[in-house]
């Protein structure tokens, strides 16, 4: 369980448009890339393309790692579906607000159903803030 203090730091640091590194596995080798992500309640949310290499890698192995700004974590990734689907309306609204500076700049074609939301559900993490180390277990 994450402590209230660590959750506050996570929300301050990542509860907005944040760049994090997302690591997947490709043929037994790590593959890492930076992604825009938004943190909420123990998970990162990422808008991506369903046919990308990262999604192909996640289909083969859902175990991932992330890191950014004095934070590292392991978790599992899942395609939760088309960005504009009725099921994702609440999440899409949060992501639209978080990514407001760039979401409608033409990079995303939301008429294409391959524009999906990737959720990274965090398992364990290490967070550093103000000379304090937080070892976090996100399980309930």
Language-model segments: which ranges?
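Short beta-strand segments
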Residues: 17-50, 56-58, 64-68
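Short amphipathic alpha-helical segments
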Residues: 2-6, 50, 87
């Amino acid at each position: 369980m994450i402590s209230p203090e660590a959750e506050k730091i996570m929300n301050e640091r990542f509860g907005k448009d944040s760049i994090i590194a997302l690591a997947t596995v490709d043929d037994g080798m790590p593959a890492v890339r930076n992604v825009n992500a938004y943190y909420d309640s123990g998970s990162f949310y990422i808008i991506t393309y369903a046919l990308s290499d990262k999604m192909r890698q996640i289909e083969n192995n859902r175990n991932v790692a992330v890191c950014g700004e004095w934070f590292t974590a392991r978790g599992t990734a899942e395609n939760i579906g088309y960005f504009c689907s009725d099921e994702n309306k609440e999440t899409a609204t949060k992501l639209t607000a978080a990514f407001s500076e760039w979401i409608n700049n033409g990079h995303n074609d939301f008429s294409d159903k391959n524009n999906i939301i990737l959720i990274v559900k965090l398992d364990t993490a290490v967070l550093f803030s103000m000379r304090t180390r937080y070892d976090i277990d996100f399980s309930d």
